[in-house]
């Protein structure tokens, strides 16, 4: 039941953010391949698990970013549903948004190809062993942690749109 509540809350935040018309900050001054190399392990695992439902190859940044809001929402929900550490959870949608913003600026075929190769390698090397699995001794703490992740990732998604 609590998981459904988290999903509904996150989806509501994303829907509200989609209606917002405020300007967002420009992406960082990092290159597209540089951003692809900074994708946290947790986000890479999510991309590996989500790319087929999005309809793109995992390293096809242009395809993944065609529906930026949907990609950010799906990555955010995946991160919230996993046991990612707080830092990865809070930066997950920022890095995806920044990559898609740079793709939208059409940096050229060579840059996109390079970034796609980097992202493909990052996703291929991502492991689930670094992601904490819940145990009976930490379950209560994880509930509070999950609530914090919902708020942080939801806020990041709201800014991304």
Curated annotation (Swiss-Prot):
Cysteines paired by S-S bonds: 46-78, 56-63, 65-100
Annotated coiled-coil segments of the chain: none
Binding site for heme: 60
A Pfam family hit: CFEM
Signal peptide span: 1-23
Molecular function in Gene Ontology: metal ion binding
Domain CFEM: 24-126
Keywords: Disulfide bond, Glycoprotein, GPI-anchor, Heme, Iron, Lipoprotein, Membrane, Metal-binding, Secreted, Signal
Predominant location category: membrane
Subcellular location: Membrane; Secreted
Superkingdom, taxonomy of origin: Eukaryota
Biological processes, Gene Ontology terms: effector-mediated suppression of host innate immune response
UniProt-listed InterPro entries: Extracellular_membr_CFEM_dom
Effect of deleting the gene: Decreases virulence in maize stalks. No sensitivity to Congo Red (cell wall disrupting agent) or sodium dodecyl sulfate (SDS) (membrane disrupting agent), and in vitro cell population growth appears normal.
Cellular-component GO terms for this entry: external side of plasma membrane; extracellular region
Membrane topology of this protein: Lipid-anchor; GPI-anchor
Domain comment, as recorded: The CFEM domain mediates interactions with host proteins.
Entry similarity comment: Belongs to the RBT5 family.
Main function: Suppresses host programmed cell death during infection by binding to Z.mays WAK17 isoform 2 and Z.mays LRR5, to prevent activation of Z.mays WAK17 isoform 1 and the downstream hypersensitive response.
Quaternary data: Interacts with Z.mays LRR5; the interaction is direct. Interacts with Z.mays WAK17 isoform 2; the interaction is direct.
Name the record gives this protein: Effector CFEM5
Protein species of origin: Gibberella zeae (strain ATCC MYA-4620 / CBS 123657 / FGSC 9075 / NRRL 31084 / PH-1)
């Amino acid at each position: 039941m609590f998981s459904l509540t988290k999903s509904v809350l996150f989806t509501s935040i994303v829907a509200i953010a989609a209606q917002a018309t405020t300007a967002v900050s420009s992406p960082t001054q990092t290159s597209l391949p540089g951003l692809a190399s900074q994708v946290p392990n947790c986000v890479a695992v999510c991309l590996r698990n989500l790319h087929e439902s999005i309809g793109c190859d995992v390293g096809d940044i242009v395809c993944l970013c065609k529906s930026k809001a949907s990609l950010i929402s799906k990555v955010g929900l995946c991160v919230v549903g996993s046991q990612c550490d707080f830092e990865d959870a809070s930066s997950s949608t920022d890095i995806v948004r920044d990559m898609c913003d740079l793709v939208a600026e059409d940096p050229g075929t060579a840059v996109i190809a390079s970034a796609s190769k980097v992202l493909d390698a990052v996703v291929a090397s991502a492991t689930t062993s670094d992601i904490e699995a819940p145990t009976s001794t930490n379950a209560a703490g994880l509930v509070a942690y999950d609530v914090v992740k919902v708020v942080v990732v939801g806020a990041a998604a709201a800014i991304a749109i």
